[in-house]
UniProtKB/Swiss-Prot annotation:
Keywords annotated in UniProt: Cell cycle, Cell division, Chaperone, Cytoplasm, Isomerase, Rotamase
GO molecular function: peptidyl-prolyl cis-trans isomerase activity; protein folding chaperone; ribosome binding
SUPFAM superfamilies, A to Z: FKBP-like, Triger factor/SurA peptide-binding domain-like, Trigger factor ribosome-binding domain
Keyword Signal: no
Organism, as annotated: Geobacter sp. (strain M21)
Biological processes annotated in GO: 'de novo' cotranslational protein folding; cell division; chaperone-mediated protein folding; protein transport; protein unfolding
Enzyme class of the recorded protein, top EC level: isomerase
Main location: cytoplasm
Source lineage: Bacteria, Pseudomonadati, Thermodesulfobacteriota, Desulfuromonadia, Geobacterales
Similarity comment text for this entry: Belongs to the FKBP-type PPIase family. Tig subfamily.
GO cellular component: cytoplasm
Domain notes from UniProt: Consists of 3 domains; the N-terminus binds the ribosome, the middle domain has PPIase activity, while the C-terminus has intrinsic chaperone activity on its own.
Protein known as: Trigger factor
UniProt keyword Transcription, yes or no: no
Length: 435
């Protein structure tokens, strides 16, 4: 068998094969013999069908089987012999198979790039300075008050405001004709919740119990009901009741509602400040990591296989779908399809692939590997985060080789990031100065 390898570019190879005629003939005879065992042709017993009829009825299938066998056997053998590291499946181009003649075909495949990483020490990056913002704690306390609020009847003559709960009847019409699904009685709506068509809730502000009014709105383009999409509508509304939120007082008793450890309001505030600081530090470090990897890529521009980009953007898509599902949302509700998502985030996926390949190269060059002690520590973190028993988590990764390999790869990448960061020139600046 003759094999030659062409470099289409740094990440794509073309393997050319010529398989000897005697090998082709042997495979053809073998395929015919196998088909003959099971061939069912009227007038002949199985295994006794003449070869000429086998060729006539099964020639196309035979050719497919032979080509498949020849390609599989020769391609994987050649990839191993040539020391190639393919990404995905090859694109095959072949001549027509003819018994007694050599069979020629080519296999074009993307391969992992050979990355010679450089200039990864002394990278200059900026880091956002951690600044405590007391307003964040105040806003969080306000949210907690809102969650514990009780609804009470509004004072007589009270004008509806954002945040109030209004009970009303409504009937919607277009060009004077009432439409299906456009009316309800005793409907309760929190003004400002965004549950209604844009502009509806704002026009209810200022109404009082007993108000009868007409609200004019436009259904947005792309509205779920195509018959209403983009059309102006009138809603006759009759306000029947208004309830206002009665917020609990911010004091020690309020704090105790959130746990025995919060005996005073100051203790609750301190905990909220601690949580906020931890979250901010995590965000700042994640953004620093992104800037560091971006700086590394700028020093080491590399080509990446499209198959790896495809794989990465698919993983991003699935992760996004899971996150949205946890919030009872969907991609469709965000106005996107799988294809539009992939198109929008493809370049981001490409940069992630570049970063991973470069970090892997740094780890390889610096002989960076996670230790068993580090693995055990990470398993403890996972157990705590998922609220599972440590032994159960450890057993899962012990029996699931793929999961363990993925975890070790992520830990290796994290250690490579730390290695580069420890040797980088990091400048802390206020958030306002970061571009």
């Amino acid at each position: 068998m003759q094999i030659s390898v062409e470099s289409v570019n740094s990440i794509k190879k073309k393997l050319n094969f010529e398989i000897p005629a005697d090998k082709v003939s042997a495979e053809v005879d073998k395929a015919y013999a196998e088909i003959r065992k099971h061939a069912a042709i009227k007038g002949f017993r199985k295994g006794k069908v003449p070869m000429s009829l086998i060729e006539k009825h099964y020639g196309e299938k035979m050719a497919e089987d032979v080509v498949k066998n020849l390609v599989q056997e020769s391609y994987f053998s050649a990839v191993s012999e040539q020391g190639l590291n393919p990404v995905g499946y090859p694109a095959i181009e072949s001549d027509q198979l003819k018994k007694g003649e050599p069979f020629k075909y080519s296999a074009t495949v993307e391969v992992f790039p050979e990355v010679e990483v450089k200039d990864y020490t002394g990278l200059e990056v900026v880091k956002e300075k951690l600044e405590v913002d007391d307003s964040v704690v105040a806003a969080r306390l306000k949210e907690m008050q809102e969650r514990m609020a009780q609804l009470g009847p509004a004072p007589e003559g009270h004008a509806a405001a954002m945040g109030d709960f209004v009970t009303f009847d409504f009937k919607g019409s277009i060009d004077g004709v009432y439409f299906e699904g456009g009316s309800a009685e005793d409907f309760q709506l929190e003004l400002g919740s965004g549950r209604f068509i844009p502009g509806f809730e704002e026009q209810m502000v200022g109404m009082t119990v007993g108000t009868n009014s007409t609200i004019k709105v436009n259904f947005p383009e792309g509205y779920g009901n195509a018959d209403l999409s983009g059309k102006p509508a009138d809603f006759e509304v009759s306000v029947k009741e208004i309830k206002v939120k009665e917020l609990p007082e911010l004091n020690d008793d309020f704090a105790k509602e959130f746990g025995e450890e919060f005996e005073t309001l100051d203790l609750l505030k301190a905990k909220l400040a601690e949580i906020n600081e931890t979250q901010e530090a995590s965000r700042i470090n994640a953004e620093l990591r992104d800037r560091l990897i971006k700086a590394l890529i700028e020093k080491n521009e590399i080509e990446v296989p499209e198959a790896l980009v495809d794989r990465q953007v698919q993983m991003m898509l699935e992760s996004t779908k899971q996150r949205l599902a946890s919030q009872r949302l969907s991609l469709d509700m965000m106005g996107m399809t799988d294809d539009s998502y992939k198109a929008q985030f493809r370049e981001a996926a490409r940069e992630q692939v570049k970063g991973s390949l470069l970090l892997d190269a740094v780890a390889e060059k610096e002989k960076i590997e996670p230790t068993e002690e580090e693995l055990e520590a990470q398993l403890s973190v996972i157990a705590e985060q998922t609220r599972q028993d440590l032994e159960k988590v450890a057993q899962l990764y012990k029996t699931n080789e793929r999961a363990k390999d993925n975890l070790m790869a992520q830990m290796r990448e994290d250690k490579a990031v730390k290695f580069i960061l420890d040797r980088a020139k990091v400048t802390e600046v206020p958030k306002a100065e970061i571009k």
